[in-house]
């Protein structure tokens, strides 16, 4: 008989049982569910709603069930619907009628809310740790490449010379913000809903603060309707996860391009590449491509949650059972991508000579020629026009800007002197950009130092 079956005269249709059941995916909440039940039973005993002896029996039974689940001795029952009913059913079978007192002053509505929040808190901690490891890898790589010149791009066209370290540090800032977003999400998840009941609280004299203390929550919810009916914390996590994936996907897109023969900026390690079933020469960046592809999957999880929630009246609705698969999938996907991306990045070979060669082509020093004129008093817009003509002339003559003679420069503007050549070497162009946040080696090293300090603070 169903634990809620007293009002019903017929058994549930088997098709409905399968359709209705969530145990296939919410069984991963078993630790949190049992932990929440142990805290609830302990609190019930403390305030005298059940006897201390009954509370002890329940706690002992729950701990035994936890051990049995982890030993693989438990086969969950689809007919019991979900992890909550499965655990309660197992408990009653183990300790008898006392087990039926566990659900006193509790609904599955506040029970599932506390389970998800506890689970998400643990996942956020794990994902933040993975992001921290990734940022540390980026910092280590950046320190090795503060003098590795490469082209910076806009519109996928070579724009200005930078360093590989500067490029890596851009991603370090993105992933640091991702860590910050997860920290904020954790704060809003760290609110205990248990004690809210189905929607209207309870008539029992619960000590919610004590339960929150037992479960490690920083705060207790202030409105029972809100506590059981919203999943904005899950949406917030999926939004943060989507941004992590977006940053990973952008980086992977560049890695895929850099690994092509046309760019040849990097070589991926064999351990993070695959071959072709027909073309013997192929070395494919499948890991990066899969991460790029899985990004859309996490976006879908976010959209699914938002769409599921948008039309729900207060308070709990069965639609909300659909929150878990989207949330769990986003968690699993982000973790899996971070776990494989970091070592792929750490083991790739950087082809510095090809990066430097690319930086010297494409007139990446054109802006520096314009800056040269502006520093000598030529209005920048006039300088821009002069250099544009110089580039056009170089294209006609098949020359680089540094290959023009001083006479050719003076035909463009009498302001040019011999010192133009020292000002437009790509290494100088990079080194001259010492402004905070710029690509000069000393500026990048300062950024690395600041980021290490911020990373340390985030970890505290």
Swiss-Prot record:
GO cellular component terms listed in the entry, alphabetical order: cytosol
Domain of life: Bacteria
Alphabetical list of InterPro entries matching this protein: Arg_succ_lyase_C (IPR029419), Argininosuccinate_lyase (IPR009049), Fumarase/histidase_N (IPR024083), Fumarate_lyase_CS (IPR020557), Fumarate_lyase_fam (IPR000362), Fumarate_lyase_N (IPR022761), L-Aspartase-like (IPR008948)
Protein source organism: Desulforamulus reducens (strain ATCC BAA-1160 / DSM 100696 / MI-1) (Desulfotomaculum reducens)
Protein name: Argininosuccinate lyase
Any one Gene Ontology BP term: arginine biosynthetic process via ornithine
Alphabetized PROSITE patterns for the sequence: FUMARATE_LYASES
EC number assigned by the record: 4.3.2.1
Catalysed reaction, written as an equation: 2-(N(omega)-L-arginino)succinate = fumarate + L-arginine
CDD domains: Argininosuccinate_lyase
Keyword terms, alphabetized: Amino-acid biosynthesis, Arginine biosynthesis, Cytoplasm, Lyase
């Amino acid at each position: 008989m169903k634990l809620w079956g007293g009002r019903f005269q017929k058994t549930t249709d088997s098709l409905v049982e399968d359709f209705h059941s969530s145990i296939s995916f919410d069984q991963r909440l078993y630790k949190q569910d049992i932990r929440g039940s142990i805290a609830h039973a302990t609190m019930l005993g403390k305030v005298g709603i059940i006897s201390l002896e009954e509370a002890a029996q329940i706690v002992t039974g729950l701990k035994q069930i936890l051990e049995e689940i982890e030993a693989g001795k438990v086969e969950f029952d689809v007919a019991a619907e979900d992890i909550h009913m499965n655990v309660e059913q197992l408990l009653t079978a183990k300790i008898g009628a006392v087990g039926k007192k566990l659900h006193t002053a509790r609904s599955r509505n506040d029970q599932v809310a506390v389970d998800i929040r506890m689970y998400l808190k643990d996942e956020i901690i794990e994902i933040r740790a993975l992001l921290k490891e990734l940022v540390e890898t980026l910092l280590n790589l950046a320190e090795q490449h503060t003098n590795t010149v490469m082209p910076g791009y806009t519109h996928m066209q070579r724009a200005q010379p930078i360093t590989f370290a500067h490029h890596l540090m851009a991603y370090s800032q993105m992933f640091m913000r991702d860590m910050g977003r997860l920290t904020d999400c954790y704060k809003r998840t760290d609110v205990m809903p248990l004690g809210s009941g189905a929607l209207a609280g309870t008539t029992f004299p619960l000590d919610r603060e004590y339960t929150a203390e037992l479960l490690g929550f920083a705060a207790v919810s202030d409105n029972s309707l809100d506590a059981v009916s919203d999943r904005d914390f899950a949406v917030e996590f999926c939004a943060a996860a989507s941004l992590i994936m977006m940053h990973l996907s952008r980086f992977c897109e560049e890695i895929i391009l850099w690994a092509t023969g046309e760019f040849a900026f990097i070589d991926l390690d064999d351990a993070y590449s695959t071959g072709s079933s027909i073309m013997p020469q192929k070395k494919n960046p499948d890991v990066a491509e899969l991460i790029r592809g899985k990004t859309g999957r996490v976006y879908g999880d976010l959209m699914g949650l938002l769409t599921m929630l948008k039309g729900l009246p207060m308070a709990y609705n069965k639609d909300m059972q659909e929150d878990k698969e989207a949330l769990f999938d986003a968690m699993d996907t982000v973790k899996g991508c971070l776990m494989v991306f970091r070592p792929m990045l750490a083991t790739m070979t950087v082809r510095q000579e090809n990066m430097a060669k690319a930086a010297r082509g494409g007139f990446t020093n054109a802006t520096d020629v314009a800056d040269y004129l502006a520093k000598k008093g030529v209005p920048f817009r006039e300088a821009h026009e002069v250099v544009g003509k110089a580039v056009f002339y170089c294209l006609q003559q098949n020359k680089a800007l540094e290959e023009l003679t001083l006479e050719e420069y003076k035909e463009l503007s009498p302001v040019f002197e011999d010192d133009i050549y020292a000002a437009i070497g790509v290494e100088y162009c990079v080194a001259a950009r010492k402004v905070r946040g710029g690509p000069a080696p000393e500026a990048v090293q300062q950024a690395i130092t600041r980021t290490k300090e911020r990373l340390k603070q985030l970890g505290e």
